[in-house]
């Protein structure tokens, strides 16, 4: 528990985060507090810096300025111990799942334990089997990722992420390229296992309906700045001009896609 908010401890505190590429600003002073044990989603149009933000938090990218604190401890560039501890207590789910096709389901899940712990082979096997059992994947232990459906591959990626028993799991566009039914299923899966394993989930996505149905809090990123932070209910009625524009655009896109799928409308391929 941190001393910042005793009634709602803050798992992750980001202050003034900045990042540029070729002198073009992508993040312009991002401030966020992610409550412990919550599902917190960062929304925004494509190209607004959501994935860059998440990769800065994960230490995949180095921010140009700003502070990131995890469990009250600053992850400063020179504090190797703090960063190592963060890596032990955090997992990252890549947009592509980043599964190894030459490894079985069981071997994929075992990989982070083999790389980051001193556990023996028997204990690693026990933990992996336990994680796969809890995610209802026991029957797939000896299969390879290519033999699984897209949804099962996503579940495998989550099993690998939670096998280290992380306190924070970062999700980078977890439903990219999926149809609405599978998007709903992925967000439902995240919500189910977040409750089961009690980790804090930080998600970046542009899928508004799914995020609002699943998240405890949402933030909206606009041109590298946070335009809104609040509950899904507050987001749905916000008068903030950019929130309204983004919300209406997402709704219009959803209605257009529904018409195309039903055959009531067509789309030109340019």
Each PLM stretch: what is its role?
Residues 163-167:
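A short, proline-enriched helix->beta-strand linker immediately N-terminal to the Walker B motif
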Residues 169-172:
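Catalytic Walker B motif of ABC-type/P-loop ATPase nucleotide-binding domains
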Residues 75-91, 121, 235-238:
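ABC ATPase NBD coupling module
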Residues 144-148, 152:
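Conserved ABC ATPase signature
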Residues 180-182:
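Helix N-cap at the start of a conserved alpha-helix in ABC-type nucleotide-binding domains
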Residues 58:
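Helix-to-loop junction immediately C-terminal to a conserved catalytic motif
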Residues 74, 121-140:
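Conserved ABC ATPase "signature" region
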């Amino acid at each position: 528990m941190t001393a910042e908010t005793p009634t709602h401890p803050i798992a992750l505190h980001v202050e003034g985060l900045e990042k540029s590429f070729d002198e073009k600003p992508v993040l312009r002073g991002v401030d966020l507090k992610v409550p412990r044990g919550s599902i917190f989603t960062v929304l925004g149009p494509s190209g607004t810096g959501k994935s860059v933000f998440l990769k800065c938090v994960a230490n995949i990218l180095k921010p140009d300025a700003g502070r990131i604190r995890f469990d009250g401890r600053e992850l400063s560039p020179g504090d190797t111990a703090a960063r190592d501890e963060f890596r032990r207590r955090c997992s990252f789910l890549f947009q592509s799942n980043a599964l190894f096709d030459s490894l079985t389901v069981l071997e994929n899940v075992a990989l982070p334990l083999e790389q980051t712990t001193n556990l023996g082979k028997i204990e690693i096997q026990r933990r992996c089997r336990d994680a796969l059992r809890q995610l209802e994947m026991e029957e797939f232990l000896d299969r390879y990722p290519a033999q699984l459906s897209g949804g099962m591959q996503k579940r495998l990626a989550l099993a690998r992420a939670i096998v280290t028993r992380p306190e924070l799991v970062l999700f980078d566009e977890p439903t990219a390229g999926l149809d609405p039914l599978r998007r709903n299923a992925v967000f439902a899966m995240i919500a189910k296992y977040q409750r089961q394993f009690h980790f804090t989930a930080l998600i970046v996505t542009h899928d508004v309906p799914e995020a609002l149905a699943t998240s405890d809090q949402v933030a909206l990123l606009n041109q590298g700045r946070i335009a809104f932070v609040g509950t899904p209910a507050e987001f749905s009625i916000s008068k903030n001009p950019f929130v309204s524009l983004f919300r209406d655009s997402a709704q219009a896109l959803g209605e257009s896609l529904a018409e195309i799928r039903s055959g009531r409308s067509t789309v030109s391929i340019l």
